[in-house]
């Protein structure tokens, strides 16, 4: 199957990259090593994945210190995902719940204890650094978004235990939270040095923009990563749930997913012109925030197209070819 479908992942706005990209990427690996997050199997892979470069594209206007926090947070998410896979926690609901509850306690200000894992100590360091730059209400919102991310992880685990594949509507509703995108959007305010008032952040148009941006990011990711999910027998992917629900071929499922993605891009562009006027200061902040959403959309695509994390292996390519020919 050719890769021409990737050319349909287009946006009517451009991304950017921080001048601190390379040094932040190197520092993130050093941070991960310091906290013992780099297992032997992850050490070589992490050098190639360049999580710091994803942060540098997602928050290109952040100062050096804030960009480092963002890069370390993004790396922490990936390391947690990888270590849950390696240790089997990703398929053990009770162990997952216990781990998540401990992480949430850390985000609420708890101190790591001797029995805690390396991820817990690393998260405590992130929380400490965030607390130096963010107000309490921001920390509470961030923690809530992480909690919703964990809840979506548990939902996926239950599905795997039952051998269940969700329908498209249910999957899309959960996908809004399973990628931790809202928690990453929270960092836009810190990166742009803005603070949106409650009434602006919770305005329906702003929330619709956030949801559209979230969908665009997650669905783009799904289109690019479906070979990896196929290889691992994981049906939590937009392409694969479309294929299952509609009993269609893999190329048709990809085409349908790309159509959904394109419609969501159109929704984002349309809603962007509908942002209401509050006052000069608030709308200046909103303009920076919406631009931050656009940076994240482009960052996700550009990094995913070059990162080895979603590059299909020889085995997954063979599986895709076999399914496509059925």
Curated annotation (Swiss-Prot):
The keyword Lyase applies. GO terms for molecular function: metal ion binding; terpene synthase activity. The record marks 82, 156 as: Plays a critical role for substrate recognition. Substrate binds at residues 175, 228, 309-310. Its cofactor is Mg(2+). Mg(2+) 1 binds at residues 81, 85. The keyword Metal-binding applies. It is an enzyme of class 4 (lyase). InterPro entries: Isoprenoid_synthase_dom_sf, Terpene_cyclase-like_2. Mg(2+) 3 binds at residues 221, 225, 229. Catalyzes the conversion of (2E,6E)-farnesyl diphosphate (FPP) into (+)-T-muurolol via a 1,10-cyclization, which requires isomerization of FPP to nerolidyl diphosphate (NPP) and then abstraction of the pyrophosphate from intermediate NPP leading to a (E,Z)-germacradienyl (helminthogermacradienyl) cation. The Asp-Asp-Xaa-Xaa-Asp (DDXXD) motif is important for the catalytic activity, presumably through binding to Mg(2+). This is (+)-T-muurolol synthase ((2E,6E)-farnesyl diphosphate cyclizing). It comes from Roseiflexus castenholzii (strain DSM 13941 / HLO8).
């Amino acid at each position: 199957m050719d890769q021409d479908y990737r050319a349909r992942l287009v946006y009517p706005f451009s991304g950017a990259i921080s001048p601190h990209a390379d040094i932040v990427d190197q520092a993130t690996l050093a941070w991960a090593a310091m906290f013992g997050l780099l297992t032997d199997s992850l050490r070589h892979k992490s050098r190639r994945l360049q999580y710091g470069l994803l942060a540098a594209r997602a928050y290109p206007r952040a100062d050096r210190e804030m960009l480092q926090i963002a890069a370390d947070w993004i790396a922490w998410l990936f390391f947690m995902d990888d270590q849950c896979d390696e240790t089997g926690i990703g398929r053990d609901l009770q162990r997952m719940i216990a781990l998540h509850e401990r992480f949430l306690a850390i985000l609420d200000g708890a101190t790591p204890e001797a029995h805690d894992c390396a991820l817990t100590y690393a998260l405590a360091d992130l929380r400490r650094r965030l607390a130096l730059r963010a107000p309490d209400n921001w920390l509470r919102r961030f923690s809530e978004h992480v909690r919703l991310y964990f809840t979506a992880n548990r939902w996926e685990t239950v599905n795997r235990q039952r051998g269940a594949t969700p329908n498209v509507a249910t999957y899309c509703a959960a996908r809004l939270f399973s990628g931790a995108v809202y928690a990453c959007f929270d960092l836009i305010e810190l990166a742009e040095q803005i603070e949106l008032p409650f009434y602006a952040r919770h305005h329906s148009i702003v929330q619709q923009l956030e949801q559209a941006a979230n969908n665009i990011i997650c669905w783009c990711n799904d289109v690019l990563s479906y070979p990896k999910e196929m290889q691992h027998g994981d049906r939590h992917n937009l392409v694969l749930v479309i294929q299952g629900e509609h009993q269609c071929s893999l190329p048709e499922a990809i085409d349908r997913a790309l159509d959904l993605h394109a419609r969501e891009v159109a929704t984002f562009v349309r809603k962007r012109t509908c942002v209401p006027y509050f006052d000069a200061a608030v709308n200046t902040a909103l303009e920076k925030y919406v631009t931050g959403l656009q940076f994240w959309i482009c960052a996700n695509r550009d990094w995913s197209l070059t990162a080895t994390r979603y590059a299909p292996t020889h085995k997954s390519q063979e599986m895709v070819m076999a399914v496509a020919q059925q």
